[in-house]
Amino acid sequence: NDSMRFRKNIERIGEIMAYELSKTLDYKNIDVQTPLGIKHTTTIAEPVVLCSILRAGLALHQGFMSFFDNAENGFVSAYRHHYDNDDKFEILVEYQAAPSFEGKNLILIDPMLATGQSLVAVLHKLHLEQKPKEIHIAVVIATPEGIEYLEKNVPSNCHLWVAALDEKLNEHNYIVPGLGDAGDLAYGIKL
C-alpha cells in the first residue's frame, strides 16, 4: 500500500474536478489595479465552501483547495455503523465544523458514492437552517444505485460530479469492483 501515491492521485482528481466544476459557477466583473493600469476581469460571484467527509475526503478536499484557494472549509464525520456482523447498517453523522453557507456554493466532497446514504445524511445535517445557492457533490467513484438514491433524496439545486462509474453494489453494499476503503488507502488502516 503506497498511501502517499494514492493521496496524490486523489488530490490530482480533485484539482481536475474543481476546474471543470468552476466552469459552471456564476461570475461577476471586477477591476484589478495593477502597477501599470486597471485590468477588467471576472471572479466567482458567490463564495465557495468546501465541505469534506472525514477522513476519506481529505485528499480530494486538498485538490479542490488547490483550485479554490479562497474557499471556506468545513468538515463532517459520517460512517456506517454495522449491527452484529449483519449487512444492515445506519449512517452516523457525529462531528460537524462548517462555516455559514447561506447563499454560497457548497461543494460536498467524498471520494466514494456507494449507497448514497452517507451523503444524504450529511446534507440533512448541514442543510437544516442554511440554504446554499448551489450544492455540488464531488465523488471519485460512484455506483448506479448511489446515483439513483441521490436523485430521489437531494434538493433540486444539487449537482453531482463523478470521475468514474463502477458497476454496482454487492450484497454488503460495497462498490464493485471499487478500490477498497479510501480512508484506509490514504491514511492507513484504522482500528
Residue ranges and their predicted role:
Residues N1-L191:
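PRPP-associated nucleotide enzymes
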